[in-house]
Curated annotation (Swiss-Prot):
This is Uncharacterized transporter DP0976. Its main location: membrane. The chain crosses the membrane at residues 10-32, 39-57, 62-84, 91-113, 146-168, 357-375, 385-407, 428-447, 452-474, 481-500, 515-537. Belongs to the AAE transporter (TC 2.A.81) family. SUPFAM superfamilies: MFS general substrate transporter, TrkA C-terminal domain-like. Keywords: Cell membrane, Membrane, Repeat, Transmembrane, Transmembrane helix, Transport. It comes from Desulfotalea psychrophila (strain LSv54 / DSM 12343).
Amino acid sequence: MDKENKMDILNNQIFLLLLITLIGMTIGKINIKNFSLDSSAIIFVGLFFGHFGYTLPKTFQTLGLVLFIYSIGLQAGPGFFFSLRQRGLKLSLGTVAIIGIGFLTTLATTYLFHFSAGTSAGIFTGALTSTPGLAVAVEIAGGQNAPAAYGVTYFFGIVGVIVFIQIIPKILNITVKDEEQALNKERDKTHKPLHFMHLELTNLNLVDRQVKHLNLKSISPVIITRLLRKNGTEPILVGGQTILQAGDHLRITGTKDDLEMMQMYLGTPVDQDIEFERVLSGEYITVSNKDICGMSLKQLNCHEVFNVQLSRISRNGIELPAGPNLRLHMGDTIHAVGSKQSLENIKKIFGNSIKDSYNFNILPIFTGLFLGFILGKIPLYIPFSGIFYLGTTGGVLIAGLFLSNIYKTGPLIWAIPSNANSFIREMGLVLFMATIGTQTGTSILATLRHEGLQLSLAGILVTTVPLISSVFICKHLLKLPFLSMLGVITGAMTSTPGLATMAKISKTPYATSSYATVYPVALISMIIYTKLLIFIVERFF
């Protein structure tokens, strides 16, 4: 193949897309001391090819943008609304405030260096390492300024968080082990560890009464899980309809104080442990039956109907208690306890097919995209500013957020399995990053020659000012524990390398759980702040 033919093949758009993706993904996998570019390497490879005149069509960019943002909405939906309630509210406020500091710092650098709206948005999203924010910037501001600025400032965002996480314990004179022990003690106060004990029923006033009529919760929040009849050989799973008999051996779960109180109410402890596992067994069952997806455990009433007790549910790697109001999702893994025959019966209801749990219907995805597109075209009036449109990104994002939270409408299951969502997100990201890289590459050197120093300085400021401010916000205003503060900071910066660094500092789940709580809020906040940034710069700067 001569040189001319080699150049001709680079003009083939499919070949160019595949080549940029392969090189970019390969470079992105290179990890040096927790630093890696991941999928963002694609945009840098695209810049290289774009500089030499090889570009991809904008239709690739638009398609990738829509797929990527919609998948973000589907992923973040349930977690986003959950984070706005209870414990997550304080963490979410910290996240919004940290990103807000980055937003204000970007406005200051824009005023100082006279950046355009696109460049300003690129600095903001690059310094805070937000690809969804960049996607919004490209759609609204257009042109090549945003991706070029993103490419320059992204490096500072990645390195800045890693260095900050490593040095902040020393600056604040924090001993991580002491912080872990303090949080463990606090956890034990609010969430006392559960124990179990075995009692023989000696209170004759409770004989021949159903468990649901004992009003146990009004006395002490314990649960009678299983019993063994006097002289019996087979254990029984206890439910509300179970009738107690004199001499029953009961297995009760609760805190130590609650269990001691139950001794006065129910009976005397049994010294010899009762071997309940002789007949009963536990299995993990996969939800793959779409007909029960969206139903609550209370609706299924597994204990009364199938004589099976559900203890916990694993969803996307997270363990959830099997509460009565918990709704089942496709792909959930349920830990169930019962007899072999009962477990076989309930498997037929849940499906228990890993292969089927990976299946998904393409119709809800395109329906959601269509609804999002329509939503983005609806004119909204903002006082003193005129007509405002959500745009394609805003429309599909809101559609994804709400539809995934609804989960199911009739036969349509809006949420999709995590593996399918990851595929759609990565495919959209590849199309978007590769295209925007090649489009920007044609003018990247001119941008660097003209504004390279200003962009670098702005990137450093927009990364470091929010990080430094985060200590005051989280530690002094919100009174967050140190490890929770680390989770909020890395979550607000949407920094996966920062998360890896944080995990090395502390093996406990406190920091990572805070990260998981605020991450959906950070994704949505970055998109909203980016829209607002462009709006302000275009009209007032």
